[in-house]
Each structure stands twice: as structure tokens, then as C-alpha cells.
Amino acid sequence: MQYISLNTTIITTTETTGYGAG
């Protein structure tokens, strides 16, 4: 996910939702 790199602050939150794993 490219937008993950842009949102460094929300990375922790995305990991919980499953986006961080991707």
C-alpha cells in the first residue's frame, strides 16, 4: 500500500486493521 508510506503516523492504526500487513 503506497498511501501507508505517506501516512507514517497512522501506520500503527493500519496494522491493526490489516493494511499494515499488506
Curated annotation (Swiss-Prot):
Keywords noted in UniProt: Amino-acid biosynthesis, Leader peptide, Threonine biosynthesis
One GO biological process term: transcriptional attenuation by ribosome
Protein task: This protein is involved in control of the biosynthesis of threonine.
Entry similarity comment: Belongs to the thr operon leader peptide family.
Record's protein name: thr operon leader peptide
Species the sequence originates in: Yersinia enterocolitica serotype O:8 / biotype 1B (strain NCTC 13174 / 8081)
